[in-house]
UniProtKB/Swiss-Prot annotation:
Source species, domain of life: Bacteria
Keyword line: Ribonucleoprotein, Ribosomal protein
GO CC term (a single one): cytosolic large ribosomal subunit
InterPro entries for this protein: Ribosomal_bL19, Ribosomal_bL19_CS, Ribosomal_bL19_sf, Translation_prot_SH3-like_sf
PROSITE patterns: RIBOSOMAL_L19 (PS01015)
Provenance organism: Bradyrhizobium sp. (strain ORS 278)
GO BP field: translation
The keyword Coiled coil belongs to this UniProt entry's keyword annotation: no
Protein name stated in the entry: Large ribosomal subunit protein bL19
Functional note: This protein is located at the 30S-50S ribosomal subunit interface and may play a role in the structure and function of the aminoacyl-tRNA binding site.
NCBIfam families reported in the protein's UniProt record: rplS_bact
Family of this protein: Belongs to the bacterial ribosomal protein bL19 family.
GO molecular function: structural constituent of ribosome
């Protein structure tokens, strides 16, 4: 392991020590609680949408969340280890076959829906 990788690993371990980052990927609906500074006050704002992709790795990893706000599509890119992110919560898991869901930008209404992924144990428990 070279010096740069070693330094990045140390920084990643230090930054992620006090954060819990859930496992999520493209197609998952997530709620990202973002710290917003207004003057001298700081408040937490929830940003809920579909993760349309993750990029980078280690300390440089980021993810893009897309939501529809008042009929207009809004995308926001969040660095995973950003100090402005208070928490990340996975609401539902989506069943997709792509790593980047950029095709959702052209879709409207029902065609833009993502099918929810079913857990095998959960489905077996429901059928019994």
């Amino acid at each position: 392991m070279n010096l740069i990788q070693q330094l990045e690993k140390e920084q990643f371990d230090k930054l992620s020590a006090n954060k819990t980052i859930p496992e999520f990927g493209p197609g998952d609906t997530v709620i990202v609680n973002v710290k917003v500074v207004e003057g001298e006050r700081t408040r937490v704002q929830a940003y809920e949408g579909v993760c349309i992709g993750r990029s980078g790795g280690g300390i440089n990893e980021s993810f893009t969340v897309r939501k529809i706000s008042y009929g207009e599509g809004v995308e926001r890119v969040f660095p995973i280890l950003s100090p402005m992110i208070d928490s990340i919560k996975v609401v539902r898991r989506g069943k997709v076959r792509r790593a980047k869901l950029y095709y959702l930008r052209q879709l409207r209404g029902k065609s833009a829906r993502i099918v929810e992924k079913q857990d095998r144990q959960q489905a077996a428990a429901v059928n019994e």
